[in-house]
Amino acid sequence: MRTLLWLGTALLLAAPALQQRSAIEPARRPAFEAALDPLERLRLGNQRFQHGQAAHFNQERDRRLDLARAQHPFALVVGCADSRVPPEIVFDQGLGDLFVVRCAGEALDDLALASIEYAVQELEVRTIVVLGHERCAAVQMALAGGELPGHLRYLGRAIGPHVEEARARLASGSGPIAPELLEAAVVQNVRGVVAEIESSEPLLAELRQRGELRVVGARYDLESGAVEWLPARR
């Protein structure tokens, strides 16, 4: 009798943990979603994430074994290194779904561009998303100006031209950074990085000119979890 009571108590104590585990049990992605346009797959994944309904597709053991042989990501995300904006979680994607290049403020250098070219040339990725986010500290630092210490100066140099364009558009001086200026600079920085990728020669620029490469800008809202897709510049 004591043994039965002990087992019953143990099962009751373990039940919440078991329920939680089953709630996040990974599953294979439905075939219909895998056949969708890459941007639509990202939109659907972000909708699941922001509504607390993440599916955690492609995280199971069989997926890991498949990926040990080869990877075939369906999109590339160039994003900020901010710990609050991990693309795989924000877009509710699994192992091997996204090729990700991250640096503070989405800043590009030769190594970042080489990583992008690798995904495009070797893995045949044809959809690139540049993902910025609201209240980006790297963008704010570039807006503040002044001499930056250590290697931060390289970050300021990469982001600086984009944020200064936003400042010029708003005719804003060098005083305190208003929220609307920071927001405009975040968006302009994304657009600037998109333009850098599109014009990167020879590989990326040639593919885009032939209509074989798509580069899209997006902005992430830290509170709602929603990704806003920026319209293409004409």
State the predicted function of each range:
Residues M1-T3:
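Positively charged n-region of N-terminal signal peptides that target proteins for export
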Residues W6-A14:
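Bacterial N-terminal signal peptides
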Residues Q20-A70, L95-G96, G105-L123, A137-R234:
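Divalent-metal-activated hydrolytic enzyme cores
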Residues G79-R84, A104-A107, H133-E134:
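Short glycine-enriched loops at secondary-structure junctions
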Residues V90-V100:
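Short helix-loop-beta junction
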Residues R126:
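Short acidic/polar active-site loop segments enriched in Thr and Asp
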Residues V130:
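Conserved functional hotspot residues or short segments at active or partner-binding sites
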